[in-house]
């Protein structure tokens, strides 16, 4: 499922401010008159503006939107100036480069933002971001494959949907609360076993073994169109919302005693545990909940319709 976030909450409040003095001092006349030349020297090509690096005597650069645009363009000549920033007191708190024409994030070496959105850019290499203290990072629809540069970051939200990421090992021990990995070629999720994830999206991932989720304090998990067959690792957890539509799951028995309030599943695939599903304290139940639509109903409507369909199918 493609997220439609507004860079909560840090990037959702981007304020474009203009700081600093644009006034220029008049140039003083030269102390010595220039010597005459025989012929006019050919015009020299102006070099690209140098990046705004801190001077040795300075503790840090006082950033403005203008200097940030210059810094980004220095490393990305094709940059179109579309970035948005949240800058407070000369410090870049958050920036959104969603859809921008950038391939190089070396500009990140001189700033310490808490939230960054690089979604829908051709970015592939995150090494210049190594050691940053990001809390939110959005990489959806990028070419990023290797997450090792973000190892050790205090990330709470990470969105990887539709990237070629296969390995989540770099996320081990992160304080992640939300992980969106829709459409990634991920088969092994053991790297998140010790993360305090509450919201997890794995739609269209080829993952089959979800044993790692037994130790994760999930509130909501989407396993839509995965290869998951066995729900036993979820048994006894505090999970409230579960989406297992279009999966090879056939047995709902492991859900017994759980406090689920929403269940999305494929009834035609279920051969055991329907009675367990009927005993759950569900508020919503359905067979579809994705970008294409949803058909959630209260149990009082869903189960009579389900029973009628089963009875009709049983008639010769």
Feature map (PLM): residue ranges:
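Bacterial N-terminal signal peptides that target proteins for export
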Residues: 1-7
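Short, low-complexity, disordered segments immediately C-terminal to signal peptides
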Residues: 20-39, 45
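Surface-exposed cap/linker segments adjacent to membranes
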Residues: 52-79
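Concave beta-strand-loop units of leucine-rich repeat
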Residues: 74-103, 112-124, 128, 132-145, ...
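C-terminal motif of bacterial Sec signal peptides marking the signal peptidase cleavage site
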Residues: 15-18
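Sec-dependent N-terminal signal peptides
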Residues: 7-13
């Amino acid at each position: 499922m493609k997220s439609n976030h507004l860079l909560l909450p840090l990037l959702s409040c981007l304020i474009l401010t203009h700081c600093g003095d644009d006034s220029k001092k008049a140039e003083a006349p030269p102390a010595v008159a220039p010597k005459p030349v025989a012929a006019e020297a050919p015009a020299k090509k102006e070099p690209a503006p140098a990046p705004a690096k801190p001077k040795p005597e300075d503790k840090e650069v006082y950033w403005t939107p203008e200097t940030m645009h210059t810094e980004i363009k220095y490393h990305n000549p094709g940059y179109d100036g579309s970035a948005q920033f949240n800058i407070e007191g000369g410090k870049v708190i958050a920036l959104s480069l969603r859809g921008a024409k950038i391939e190089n994030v070396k500009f990140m070496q001189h700033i310490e933002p808490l939230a960054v959105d690089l979604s829908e850019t051709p970015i592939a290499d995150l090494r210049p971001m190594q050691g940053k203290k990001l809390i939110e990072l959005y990489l959806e629809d990028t070419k990023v494959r290797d997450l090792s540069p973000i190892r050790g970051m205090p990330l709470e939200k990470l969105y990887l949907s539709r990237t070629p990421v296969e390995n989540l090992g770099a996320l081990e021990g992160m304080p992640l609360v939300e992980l969106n990995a829709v459409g990634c070629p991920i088969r092994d999720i053991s790297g998140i076993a010790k993360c305090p994830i509450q919201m997890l999206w794995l739609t269209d991932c080829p993952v089959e073994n979800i044993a790692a989720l037994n130790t994760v304090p999930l509130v909501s998990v989407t396993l839509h169109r995965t290869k998951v067959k066995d729900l036993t690792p979820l048994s006894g957890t505090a999970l409230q919302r579960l989406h297992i539509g279009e999966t090879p799951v056939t047995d709902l028995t492991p859900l017994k005693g759980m406090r689920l309030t929403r269940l999305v599943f494929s009834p035609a695939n279920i051969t055991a545990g329907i009675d367990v599903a009927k005993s759950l304290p569900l508020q919503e139940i359905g067979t579809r909940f994705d970008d294409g639509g949803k058909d959630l109903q209260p149990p009082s409507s869903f189960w009579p319709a389900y029973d009628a369909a089963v009875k009709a199918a049983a008639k010769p």
